[in-house]
Amino acid sequence: MARGSLSLPALRGGLLALLAAALFGISTPLVQRLGAGLGAFTTAALLYAGAAVVGALSLRTAAHEARLQRSDAWRLIGMAGFGAALGPVALSWGLQHTSGASASLMLTLEALFTATLAWWLYSETMDRRVWAAMLLLLAGGMALVMDQGLQGGTQLLGLLAVLLATVAWGVDNTLSRGLAERDPSQVVMAKASLGAAATACLAMAWGEPLPTLTAALGLFAVGATGYGLSLRFYLLAQRAFGAARTGSVFAFAPFIGAAVAFGFGERSAGWLMLLGGLLMLAGVLLHLAESHGHEHAHDPL
């Protein structure tokens, strides 16, 4: 029913999804600035240490929140490995070697990998509009790669590292489906703690330099909001708004990040970057329209 899609829980879910997108989108250019000169493992460890504290502070023991079970352990380890270790490490390294706006826009491909994995592993239906949206996202990503390729090898490698981060987070999103009904605070704390511990150990083993107090506190705060609160809001939004629509709204995060990067003074955008951004925006809008129509048509009476 049309009325069902405008219910208060759905509206709340939509707002939570938008807030999650804004927090994560803003975090990307901030990580680029605060992480300048730091090792990628150190940056990732500080980000997820902040996220872990948010999870710990918001822990609930309410009866309506399903607690994590032993059977969730391997799924959590996978989420931490891909989403809280490989993803942020690849992003942190990439941000130091490529354009902040390009990196933000490239993160749009997370939606492509998430949707493709859902189709492959869970047999989710993907009609022609969804495939068209995915092709637009892919074409936009190719335009960004070409743009950074023209800037030089280092810029291209940085963007490819960001692409690796989107693959890692696509796997993370796929694994998180099985924990959507668990206490989101527990999920955030467990995933972030595992990721922070792993990347901190790697930072020490790699001999990365210690950050300044300002950089450490800044990255900790960005991790608390852009990764901890963002993930919590994302999981809560999935319950009321549906996984497909939540993912589609969250796909606007890269555009928020690109806008903030331009606000910080980045002016490296060429016509290929603008073309890539427009193609990706068209893909996200098409995917959002399809997701809304699909879930709308199947609303229970």
Model-predicted segments: where are they?
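Juxtamembrane helix-entry segments on the extracytoplasmic side of multipass membrane proteins
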Residues: 8-14, 37-45, 68-74, 146-166, ...
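Hydrophobic transmembrane alpha-helices of multi-pass small-molecule transport proteins
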Residues: 55, 77, 117, 129-148, ...
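Glycine-/small-residue-enriched transmembrane alpha-helix faces in small-molecule transporters
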Residues: 1-45, 51, 151-178, 301
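Helix-helix packing/entry segments at the starts of transmembrane helices
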Residues: 20-21, 44-46, 88, 102-111, ...
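Specific transmembrane alpha-helical segments of multi-pass solute transporters/efflux pumps
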Residues: 23-28, 56-102, 107, 115, ...
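Cytoplasmic-side transmembrane-helix entry/capping segments in multi-pass membrane proteins
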Residues: 17-18, 71-80, 126-138, 158-159, ...
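Hydrophobic/aromatic residues within transmembrane alpha-helices
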Residues: 34, 43, 47, 94, ...
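Transmembrane alpha-helices of multi-pass small-molecule transport proteins
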Residues: 23, 37-86, 113, 168-172, ...
